Regions:
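A short alpha-helical cap/connector motif
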Residues: 1-83, 87-111, 115-256
Length: 256
């Protein structure tokens, strides 16, 4: 299943009222949105029809989130759904997650693109192939180690995979407090240490299986006042049926 097809189904299942997209490019994923949307990209070239209430910012995500109130564009409402597809380097992906979670709610969903490189070359920090994921892939290992309370689901979409992250806690400072330590351990010079099980997609679930799972109802029906602990507990009880590839807390070589 193509990643855009999967993302379209995610929008349909959650019916978000607010959406954030980091990394717009030509706008193909942005075109899926039908709600109040904040889109960030310093060099977008949108070439498709957009059908949402859009606030488009030609800037970097770091600059955007450094503003006094990043939620002005949503009239103070946190992001219900976010798609992170910015600069394909671990430090940027990590900062984007930290900023996005801080402006989300416990019932929100964050989706990363480009988490399943098909070779060490494709995962290189310095791009030299036609298709490039960069070293975003270690974010799975980072979240499993530092934020084990989160529900994370790698999805085997075409062509470079997605990662769903839920059970968010906007008050968490764990990643920000350990930012330098995380990069010292998980950021590597090229060639990248991409495990064979990652190349073979053994860490990811089939897209349709994820779409058919029952955890979507937890996010869709959650109260705006639900606590992170409550959402995390409900998600864990639903997502356990997805099996070993989902939510494993073992170190799987994603960058450690």
């Amino acid at each position: 299943m193509r990643y855009l097809t999967f993302l379209d189904q995610v929008h349909a299942k959650l019916s978000p009222q607010t959406y954030l997209e980091i990394g717009v490019r030509s706008g193909t994923s942005l075109a899926l949105a039908r709600c109040r949307t904040v889109a960030i990209d310093p060099a977008f070239t949108i070439s498709v029809e957009i059908q949402c209430d859009l606030r488009l910012f030609r800037t970097t995500s770091d600059e955007y989130f450094n503003r006094p109130d990043p939620l002005v564009a949503t009239e103070g409402r946190p992001f219900d759904l976010a798609f992170i597809d910015g600069l394909h380097l671990l430090e940027f992906a990590l900062r984007d997650f930290i900023h996005t979670e801080r402006h989300s709610s416990p019932r929100s969903l964050i989706v990363f693109d480009d988490v399943l490189p098909r070779s060490p070359d494709e995962a290189a920090r310095v791009p030299h192939t036609r298709f490039w994921t960069g070293d975003v892939y270690p974010i799975m290992g980072v979240l499993r180690r530092y934020r084990p309370e989160l529900t994370i689901i790698p999805v085997d979409t075409t062509s470079r995979g997605l990662l769903l992250v839920m059970g968010l806690d906007p008050q968490s400072q764990t990643l920000a407090d350990n930012y330098d330590e995380i990069l010292a351990e998980y950021r590597h010079p090229d060639p990248q240490p991409v495990s064979q099980e990652m190349v073979d997609r053994l860490l990811a679930l089939p897209p349709q299986r994820v779409l058919d799972a029952t955890f979507w109802s937890v996010l869709a029906k959650a109260s705006a006042n639900a606590s992170p602990d409550q959402i995390q507990l409900e998600l864990a009880s639903h997502a356990a049926s997805l099996g070993a590839a989902f939510g494993s807390r073992r170190e799987s070589g994603e960058g450690a």
